[in-house]
């Protein structure tokens, strides 16, 4: 069954806006789990703009929730990950001036270095993931460096969906779905797990949730936004319902 990983970075963003101690993203993780989240995603950025080291440490010390740590492929972050031992570590590109992650990791440009990073994480018993565009050359490179999971960047699909008036049958939207579908087929053929995420919401999630072989979707901003009005447990529950309905129908 398809799984949902809830990104709680935006809970920390609200807290950091006032440089205070609430809302607590760790409690947010508990609420998301009670709502049906299969795992929690946090991005410990180099500039610590939202999630802090103490948040990730407390998540490991006080909860039993499956943790996916998004991280840049730096020595500092690899050291932190190897100490914390999250269930999964996902390598992402990171720019100090970006509002959110703007594209997939360019593995081809740094293949040798990333292979070493993946090896260190795997030796620590951590499942390794890479966040990449739906590009067959990047997928093949992910396999060469030893990644266990490829998470496909769904931003281009989400933007096309919005630009075309939320019409899932618009040619531009169908073209993006086809790219992700093909990427998923390649990922699975190469023996890796097929995940996806970025800019997914309650309107656009179902066409992707029904793709063959997709294992997990990571969603954050839309769920936290919905939680403002209905609470976090209910926001997560609603997303899980949509995902499961789509997955059961399939393609």
Swiss-Prot record:
- Catalytic residue positions: 43, 70, 198
**Which EC class is the enzyme in?**
transferase
Give one GO biological process term.
Answer: pyridoxine biosynthetic process
Q: Which UniProt keywords apply?
A: Cytoplasm, Pyridoxine biosynthesis, Transferase
**Reactions the enzyme catalyzes:** 3-amino-2-oxopropyl phosphate + 1-deoxy-D-xylulose 5-phosphate = pyridoxine 5'-phosphate + phosphate + 2 H2O + H(+)
One GO CC term on file: cytosol
The cross-references to InterPro entries, in alphabetical order and at most eight, read: Aldolase_TIM, PyrdxlP_synth_PdxJ, Pyridoxine-5'_phos_synth
Which subcellular locations apply to this protein? Cytoplasm
Molecular function via GO: pyridoxine 5'-phosphate synthase activity
Q: Which residues bind 3-amino-2-oxopropyl phosphate?
A: 7, 18, 199, 220-221
E.C. designation(s)? 2.6.99.2
Classification via Pfam families: PdxJ
The record's section on SUPFAM superfamilies has: Pyridoxine 5'-phosphate synthase (SSF63892)
Give, as in the UniProt entry, the pathway in which the protein acts.
Cofactor biosynthesis; pyridoxine 5'-phosphate biosynthesis; pyridoxine 5'-phosphate from D-erythrose 4-phosphate: step 5/5
- Write down the position(s) of the site called Transition state stabilizer: 151
Principal location listed in the UniProt entry:
cytoplasm
Family stated for the protein in its record: Belongs to the PNP synthase family.
Its annotated function is as follows:
Catalyzes the complicated ring closure reaction between the two acyclic compounds 1-deoxy-D-xylulose-5-phosphate (DXP) and 3-amino-2-oxopropyl phosphate (1-amino-acetone-3-phosphate or AAP) to form pyridoxine 5'-phosphate (PNP) and inorganic phosphate.
Subunit record text:
Homooctamer; tetramer of dimers.
Q: What is this protein called?
A: Pyridoxine 5'-phosphate synthase
To which species is this protein native?
Answer: Dechloromonas aromatica (strain RCB)
């Amino acid at each position: 069954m398809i799984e949902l990983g809830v990104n709680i970075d935006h809970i920390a963003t609200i807290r950091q806006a006032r440089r205070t101690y609430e809302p607590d993203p760790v409690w947010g993780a508990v609420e998301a789990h009670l709502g049906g989240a299969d795992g929690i995603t946090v991005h410990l950025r180099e500039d610590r703009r939202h999630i802090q080291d103490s948040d990730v440490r407390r998540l490991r010390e006080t909860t039993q929730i499956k943790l996916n740590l998004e991280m840049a492929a730096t020595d500092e972050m690899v050291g932190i990950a190897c100490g914390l031992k999250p269930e999964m570590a996902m390598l992402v590109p990171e720019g100090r001036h970006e509002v959110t992650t703007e594209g997939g990791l360019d593995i081809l440009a740094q293949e040798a270095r990333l292979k070493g990073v993946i090896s260190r994480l795997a030796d620590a018993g951590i499942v390794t993931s890479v966040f990449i565009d739906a590009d067959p050359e990047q997928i093949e490179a992910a396999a060469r460096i030893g990644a266990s999971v490829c998470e496909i960047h769904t931003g281009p699909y989400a933007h096309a969906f919005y630009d075309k008036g939320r019409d899932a049958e618009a040619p531009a939207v169908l073209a993006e779905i086809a790219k992700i579908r093909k990427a998923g087929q390649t990922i699975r053929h190469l023996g890796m797990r097929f995940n996806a995420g970025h800019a997914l919401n309650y309107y656009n999630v179902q066409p992707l949730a029904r793709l063959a072989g997709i294992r997990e979707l990571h969603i954050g901003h839309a769920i936290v936004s919905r939680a403002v009005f209905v609470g976090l447990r209910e926001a997560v529950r609603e997303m899980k319902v949509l995902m499961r309905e789509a997955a059961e129908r399939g393609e």
